[in-house]
Swiss-Prot record:
Mg(2+) binds at residues 242, 263. Pfam families: MMR_HSR1, MnmE_helical, TrmE_N. GO terms for molecular function: GTP binding; GTPase activity; metal ion binding. GO terms for biological process: tRNA methylation; tRNA wobble uridine modification. Belongs to the TRAFAC class TrmE-Era-EngA-EngB-Septin-like GTPase superfamily. TrmE GTPase family. Residues 228-394 form the TrmE-type G domain. The gene is mnmE. This is tRNA modification GTPase MnmE.
Amino acid sequence: MRNSLSFQDEPIVALATPLGVGALAVVRMSGQGVFDIARKVFHKQGAPDFHLASSKGFQAHFGTIHDAQGVVDEVIALVFRSPRSFTMEDMVEFSCHGGPVVVQHLLKALIDAGCRLAEPGEFTRRAFLNGRIDLLQAEAIGEMIHARSESAFRTAVTQMQGRLSRQLEEMREKLLHSCALLELELDFSEEDVEFQNREELREDVQRLQGEINRLLDSYQHGRLLKEGVATVLVGSPNAGKSTLLNALLGEERSIVSHQPGTTRDYIEEPLLLGSTLFRLIDTAGLREGEEEVEHEGIRRSYRKIAEADVVLYLLDVSHPDYCNELSDITSLLEQASPNVQLLLVANKCDAITNPTERLAQLQAAMPQATVCGIAAKEGDGLEALKQQMSNMVAGLDKLHEASVLITSMRHYEALRRASDALENGACLVAEHAETELVAFELRSALEAVGEITGKVVNDEILSLIFERFCIGK
């Protein structure tokens, strides 16, 4: 990838819509000289001498694209003039017919006329480098495009609009003010001048740390909104996990067999309940495997359990020894995260005579669990199970409306470093430490917060962020 930190305005071009067959496709150009490039290939209908450089911004013009062989397609050319464009550069967007061959001819004509094919995320990267958006907003655009649930989409939109950016900028301004006063003291160290009362400084630092810690606390919920609730289906072989997965999805996604050990590796599929995404993970049945490949499948099951947000343990209550599994469930939870939730699903309730009593016994034996009864093969109880799953994350889909959430591990790590630095700084102030030591910690916190919005940035971070974008974004 090219050096993102150097100023770039060379003309770039890319397809901005998905490649494939459709009614329309949009090809966009940005950079210095795009109007001159367009003049070489675009002919406005009824105005052979027309030049897009003479057009006002936000105006559309109908015409044809030409290459060396002749007419390529009829298009609409939409003009954006710097700085009133997404990249803050001159831009032209061509709407053409949505066939892959048409698009290829149009792209080739523009490249032959002087454009360079854009790199992944280069349009958004230019928007960031030119000051149109900050780095957090750039990431939010990517998250909005890839959102798989309404909640994830709304959270990304909130961040794209700058709500979190404004909060972080307020923190940064406060830190910058304190750092400036401490730097003044260092400049006048021989005169023993104190520009900021130390008790007030300690209180300010602790208050800022509290704000940052509240953002850190939001990451667990933000991660669930963005990535989905990791729901691991666990149980003994032939408990009905694959049958349940297929029933929840409404399609035959997992192989169902009476032969134990059919599932050798985990299968992951998305399930949208309301506006919350669940990532259903069907795992190999927990038993002593007879083959090495089955052993590996079981090891992978345990790894997924350790990463789970919800463990959905499927229990075959028609089996005479089903109670023996309860102690196994307790041992299993010891390998899961402390915040994991247990959903104990009693399967094959249609095969017993007293399902209500059986469920009550299970609830009494496992008070930490949410207990639900189903008959997966017949589809009985599935709606109640889905409701229980939704109840376990109740309110998650509304959090983006009331709170500012952290959804990115990069943001979380930067804020954690900022919090640690502020905690160190407050302790140093309380211990009447040297001003230089306090200033170092506050500068560290300032730098960490600045990394999130791009006030402090390096090319490696930019490359990691923007290479995840599509070419035309």
